[in-house]
Regions:
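Hydrophobic alpha-helical context, especially transmembrane and signal-peptide helices
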Residues: 28-29, 75
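Generic detector of low-complexity/intrinsically disordered segments
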Residues: 11-14, 38, 43-44
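Bacterial N-terminal signal peptides
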Residues: 29-41
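N-terminal hydrophobic alpha-helix used for membrane targeting or insertion
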Residues: 6, 12, 33-34, 115, ...
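N-terminal secretory signal peptides that target proteins for export/translocation
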Residues: 1-27
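N-terminal processing/targeting junctions
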Residues: 15-19, 36, 144
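Low-complexity, acidic/polar, glycine-enriched regions of mature
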Residues: 46-218
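Compositionally biased, low-structure terminal segments
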Residues: 10-13, 31, 69, 139
Length: 218
């Protein structure tokens, strides 16, 4: 199965520019990434099997800034990959979707009330505005080999109604594909949170990690 996956990735990378296929509903959330599951979804084309959404996730690291940042908190935010699709005609393409409302702070050092407050603010109009932008989407445009079980996955990431081109290095271990990239909130029309006159704030740059699992038997 893994040989077939690698062969599929390699052959597509050598000769096919993958085009985004259908207009997807725009989403707003820290990323993404999901963005990044391009390699995993493309891999499943070898057997036309789905990704394992139960074991596929997006994780975002949000960092504090400002004069009094020592009194603030960094945050780890996570959401499952909601769905993915492979289109074989008229041209090969892949898509990923994350439901923005599924994002939750994992911060173990925060009490439950504080985590709930962080999540409410994150999903609200001030940041993600999930009522208006319920999903994050990614559609691949090209995949280039970068070594053994490694690829550079390029695609279009849509957050908060803004689409940006991104390229993410992806590594495979067994059936799991992992990638990491950094994005800026302002690139997607999101103003980083600032409180107390900016003495405590969130950095514009976010680190985004993903883990995509191919379904058993595919």
């Amino acid at each position: 199965m893994h040989t077939a996956i690698g062969t599929t990735l390699g052959s597509l990378a050598r000769g096919i520019d993958i085009a985004a296929v259908r207009h997807m509903s725009t989403g707003r959330c820290f990323v993404v990434a999901t963005i990044l599951g391009g390699a995993a979804l493309l891999a499943t084309q070898a057997t036309a099997g789905p990704i394992d959404v139960r074991n596929s996730k997006l994780t975002v690291f949000v960092y504090k800034a400002g004069l009094f940042s020592a009194f603030a908190d960094n945050h780890v935010i996570s959401a499952p990959i909601a769905s993915g699709a492979i289109v074989t005609a008229p041209a090969p393409a892949i898509e990923l979707v994350v439901n923005a409302a599924d994002l939750v702070p994992l911060d173990p050092d925060l009490d439950p009330a504080k985590r709930a407050e962080v999540r409410t603010r994150m999903l609200g109009e001030e940041v993600l505005d999930t009522g208006k932008f319920p999903t994050i989407t990614f559609a691949s445009t090209a995949i280039e080999p970068a070594g053994s079980d490694r690829w550079n996955v390029s695609g279009r990431l849509t957050i908060h109604g803004v689409t940006k081109a991104v390229t993410i290095p992806v590594v495979r271990a067994d059936r799991v594909y992992r990638g990491e990239t950094r994005i800026r909130q302002r690139d997607f029309g999101i103003n980083p949170i600032r409180i107390a006159g900016g003495t405590v704030s969130v950095k514009d740059e976010l680190k985004v990690e993903f883990e995509i699992s191919a379904a058993e038997g595919n």
